[in-house]
C-alpha cells in the first residue's frame, strides 16, 4: 500500500475498488458491530483474507472506501472508455470474453470501450462495433506461470478515426521466489488449502481455486454440515482436484 501511495503522489493515477477491497471494508464493519457470524478465522475458507486484513491500517481503509467501482476515462480528442473491476455496477460480476452478460454490458454502456479485470483471464471481444478488453492479472495470472499479466492501450487511426488498440503484456518475474515468500510468511499454515491452490497457479498456471471452494462446501453439506471450514473437507476436495500440498 505504501508503494501505491508513493507512486500516486508522483504520477497521475486512477484507481478502482475491486472485490477484495470490498471484502476488507465489509469485514471491518462486521468487527466494528461485534458480529461473530461472518468474522474471518484462520482456516482455508477465510484465512488468506484475514492475513491481508491484519496488514491494513486506517489510511488503507479510508483509501478503499473512497475508490469508485467504475469510472469513465475521457481524453480530449479520443474515444471515451468505461473502466471497472468486475462490471459497471458490481466489482464481483464476471465478464468473460464469451459471456452473454459481457455483450449486454457492451450494449448498455454509453462508450465504445469497456475495460475490466476480475476474471484473471486476459482477452478482447468486439461486439456490435464496441470493444471489451480484459487486462488479466498481475498477482495471480492464470495460464501463464512465471509471468504477470497487464495491458496498455495505444491510440491508432483507423479510417480517419481515432481508436484504442490493446497490447497485452506478459512480464516475467521470479514466481519461485514469491512462493518461498509465501512459505516464510506463515500464510500456508493459516489458510492451507486455498493458499496451496494459489501456489499451484503461481507454479503451473492451473487454477482450481473456485472449484476447490465449491467442492469443499459440497462435501460438507453431503456430510450434514452447513459449515465447510473443517480442513478435512478442503483436504478431500484438494485431493480430488489434484491440488498439491506445498507445505
Language model segments and positions:
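Active-site neighborhood of phospho(di)ester-bond hydrolases with catalytic His/Asp-centered motifs
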Residues: 14-19, 84, 113-122, 132-136
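Short acidic, glycine-rich surface-loop motifs adjacent to enzyme active sites
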Residues: 80-88
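A short secondary-structure junction signal
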Residues: 86, 92-97, 125-128, 144-147
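Active-site environment of divalent metal-dependent phosphoester hydrolases
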Residues: 20-25, 89, 115-126, 140-143
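Active-site neighborhood of divalent metal-dependent phosphoester bond hydrolases
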Residues: 3-71, 78-80, 96-110
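Acidic, His/Gly-rich catalytic cores of divalent-metal-dependent hydrolytic chemistry
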Residues: 127-135, 139-247
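Short loop/helix-cap segments at secondary-structure boundaries that form the rim of catalytic
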Residues: 73-74, 106, 123-129
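Conserved hydrophobic/aromatic beta-strand scaffold that supports enzyme active sites
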Residues: 70-72, 83, 124, 150-152
Amino acid at each position: 500500500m505504501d508503494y501505491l501511495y508513493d507512486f500516486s503522489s508522483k504520477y497521475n493515477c486512477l484507481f478502482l475498488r475491486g472485490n477484495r477491497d470490498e471484502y476488507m471494508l465489509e469485514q471491518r464493519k462486521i468487527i466494528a458491530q461485534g458480529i461473530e457470524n461472518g468474522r474471518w478465522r484462520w482456516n482455508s475458507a477465510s484465512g488468506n483474507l484475514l492475513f491481508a486484513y491484519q496488514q491494513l491500517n486506517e489510511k488503507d481503509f479510508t483509501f478503499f472506501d473512497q475508490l469508485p467501482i467504475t469510472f469513465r476515462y475521457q481524453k480530449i480528442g479520443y474515444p471515451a472508455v468505461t473502466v471497472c473491476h468486475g462490471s459497471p455496477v458490481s466489482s464481483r460480476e464476471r465478464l468473460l470474453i464469451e459471456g452473454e452478460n459481457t455483450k449486454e454490458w457492451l450494449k448498455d454502456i454509453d462508450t465504445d470501450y469497456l475495460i475490466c479485470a476480475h476474471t484473471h483471464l486476459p482477452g478482447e471481444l468486439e461486439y456490435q462495433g464496441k470493444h471489451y478488453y480484459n487486462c488479466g492479472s498481475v498477482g495471480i495470472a492464470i495460464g501463464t506461470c512465471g509471468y504477470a499479466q497487464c495491458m496498455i492501450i495505444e491510440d491508432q487511426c483507423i479510417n480517419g478515426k481515432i481508436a484504442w488498440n490493446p497490447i497485452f503484456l506478459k512480464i516475467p518475474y521470479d514466481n519461485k521466489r514469491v512462493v518461498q515468500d509465501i512459505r516464510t510468511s506463515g500464510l500456508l499454515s493459516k489458510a492451507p488449502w486455498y493458499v496451496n491452490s494459489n501456489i499451484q497457479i503461481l507454479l503451473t498456471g492451473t487454477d482450481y481455486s473456485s472449484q476447490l471452494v465449491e467442492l469443499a462446501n459440497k462435501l460438507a453439506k453431503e456430510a450434514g454440515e452447513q459449515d465447510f471450514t473443517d480442513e478435512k473437507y478442503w483436504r478431500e476436495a484438494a485431493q480430488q482436484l489434484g491440488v498439491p500440498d506445498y507445505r
